[in-house]
Amino acid sequence: MLDFSGREVVVTGGTGALGSAVVGRLITAGAIVHVPVYIAEELQRFPYRGHEAVRVHEGLDLGKEGDVARLYGATSALYASVHVAGGFSMGPIADTSLESWEHLMRMNATTCFLCCREAVRTLNGGEGRIVNVAARPALVPTAQMSAYAASKAAVSALTLSLAEETAESGVWVNAIVPSIIDTEVNRAAMPDADHAAWPSPEQIAETIAFLASPQNAVTRGALVPVYGRS
């Protein structure tokens, strides 16, 4: 049984489909969860707004060092940091602009780097957990996803390197590797697909919560597939 009692967890991207599931699982396990929000409208769909165990931090851009520092500075007993925030786009490389490339790198790789760095600084040599979100195209060659795959490959490499760097201090760093998640957006985009093969956000949240928990006593430096049958 997972137990986060007395522990604080940062969850970026916490208002999205997967992020909300992670927040819900963590508060069920007793965590105080800090959720940064950049676009205020995102809170309208966030089911845990106003929950006594959730701290919402509005107006924070995770691509800016100062905003990330303010987020982690608001914690007092940080134990884990879960980085779900990111973005997706695809298309032939010939049609991919430099702006699109840099946008995806910032959304996926830069935000992950800044949050990992600030989490390590905040933990300050103490025990903790970091969980990143990579993606299957970063590991399995996939056409028309050059920019997206590269940005998530950066997340994967960051995870593996940081896991070695922080091992002695007891900070376990891992990443989950999803393929297609069963969300309303994905169902609408792929109406003829086998939706039953896709893992739900709640199922993936279970894996994330374990990796972020004190009960994860040995797993570090892992890129954990959460594909389901997809």
Predicted regions and their residues:
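Active-site loop-to-helix junction immediately N-terminal to the catalytic Tyr of the SDR YXXXK motif
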Residues: 96, 141-149, 161
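Alpha-helical segment proximal to the catalytic Tyr-Lys
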Residues: 121, 164-168
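Residue(s) in the substrate-gating loop at a strand-loop-helix junction
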Residues: 135
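Substrate-binding pocket helix/loop in short-chain dehydrogenase/reductase
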Residues: 92-93, 100-102
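C-terminal helical subdomain
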Residues: 168, 175, 183, 193-230
